[in-house]
Amino acid sequence: NRGHARCIATGLKYIFEKEEFDYVIPMDGDGEDRPEEIIEFIKSSEKAPDQTIVGERIKRSEAFIFKFCYFFHKIITLVFTGHSIKFGNFTCLTKSTVEKMINEKATWNSFSGALTKVEKNKFSIPSIRGERYFGPSKMSFSNLINHSLSIISVFKNTVLIRSALFIII
């Protein structure tokens, strides 16, 4: 996922510097971000044109073990950062959000962590994780741990304070 974050950061920087746009919808091309849900992002952006929209996962298509590990990842992230991050790359970003993202160093390491950090004016729409077009996911347990640490690293000051409080209490 860090590779994905870097690719998205590169694309956002390019689009911001070279193209005229109102919104950008980053998404995976492997089938897990369902193209038919783009229409919901567009409808939502018409209702709230100044807000960034995130696709909140309401259903996943992976095996039970991965779902369990992913749940554990979300809990760890919440405990250490104070943020419940229930979205990935599949978002509809306003131009002002894209500008904030390209100016945030953490964007190159964790897309969802950086977006949570820089954009308070966002709302979510439900998103069902689609079936992959080709082959199984390469997200192993160790990759999921690295993904968690990437998100947590965005909020290092919060993590330090929370860790100190956990030790004291």
PLM regions and their residue ranges:
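Alpha-helical structural context
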Residues: 18, 79-80, 118, 155
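Acceptor/aglycone-binding surface of glycosyltransferases and processive sugar-polymer synthases
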Residues: 2-15, 23-26, 35-109, 131-142, ...
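Hydrophobic helical membrane-anchoring modules
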Residues: 113, 117-169
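Active-site-proximal cofactor/substrate-binding loop regions of enzyme domains
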Residues: 29
